[in-house]
Amino acid sequence: MKRLGIVAAAMLVVVPAFAGVVEDSGIRGGIVVQIGCKDVKSLANLLVNNRVLVHWLDVDAKRIEEVRDSLRSDRLYGRISAAVFDGENLPYTDNLINLMVIEDPQCRITQEEMMRVLVPGGMVVVGGKKTTKPVPSNIDEWTHFLHGADNNAVANDTVVAAPRTIQWVSNPRWGRSHEEAASVSALVSANGRVFAIMDEAPNISIRFMPDWKLVARDAFNGMLLWKRDIPAWSDHLRHFRAGPVHLPRRLVAVGNRVYVTLGLDAPVSILDASTGETLKVLKGTERTEEIAVDDGVVYLAVGTSEVYRRGGGLHERGEPKAADFRYIVAIDPGSGRQVWKKDFTGTDFLLPMSMTVRNGSVFYQDINGVGRLDARTGTEIWEKKRRTVARRMSFSSPTVVATDEVLLVADRIPKVDSREPQQMAA
């Protein structure tokens, strides 16, 4: 990871002693460092929840040993650990620490060194004065499966480069199988956090029943923030790359909110990104397969996309039976109110992975062509006829990417000379 050259924005707010310093910082989880400490009790006060780890630094090796013994006797060692340092150089890689607390305002650590180890958005409190490290404009988030709601899988990030070091590693380190369904089903990032839907069942054999979880970690240090159970997901014995293609489109993170279906036939839930707490369940959104969030509005593709798939139904393996409806709906996440709805019935079958949102427009592709809707009202602006295949393999989907100037569409076509237009092109 490249070193970030950042000038900190100082906020001169004094907090009394160090009581409640973690709560006052607004940091809900991560790695907290305290430099200098009068007693173990003040260290224990930093453990405000199970999402926090504390590391104490001091120049006095004898004092470190005393604190370690005290932590062990109180059964706190592990969640709190201690180490010696030279008083100037912090023993951390760049962008690792969420909160640093320094009792002595005359400490020899330079502000540049403090800013080096803080994560973007992290905070240092020196003698009661807080300084926050700003989030640089040259790093980006990956809020949807294909970066954003426009499906343009290109990050606006100039810091990312060829890997030089490993910032952090978490479990599971290996997938359960490379022949069946992938162990990581979806992955997005927002506001300094990474969210993933993954199978945490034992990897000794793919024949064990799956254990799907939604897992949240700090994006810079990998600290586990929270987990949510997903009771029913796609069949884990599906062959690798056999679909369904909509699985990674069921998870979106924007700001401090996570939008997810906690099950194949579950409605869309809106979660607090820092705690995993459910803030709202959008009623009537069962069987949602794709989620997009743009300009404060939630757009959903609802209904079964694999109804015309080859190979028969997977409901016999525990997956829900195919729905007899298919539509795009816009919802106000604050009230849960439906703003508009566009039905796709009969021959107007909405293809998976095609819902795209950009600059006040919603684009889609059905088996008859490509269309554009007004994102505010759902009114159809135009439709371009472009016949395509309805009955296709479960891994097959079109590519639809929106830019400011053009809409890019790529898909297979039916056989021109075939009397059965739903056959796949050779």
Positions of predicted regions on the chain:
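Conserved SAM-binding strand-loop segment of SAM-dependent methyltransferases
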Residues: 75-87
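Conserved class I S-adenosyl-L-methionine
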Residues: 27-47, 51-55
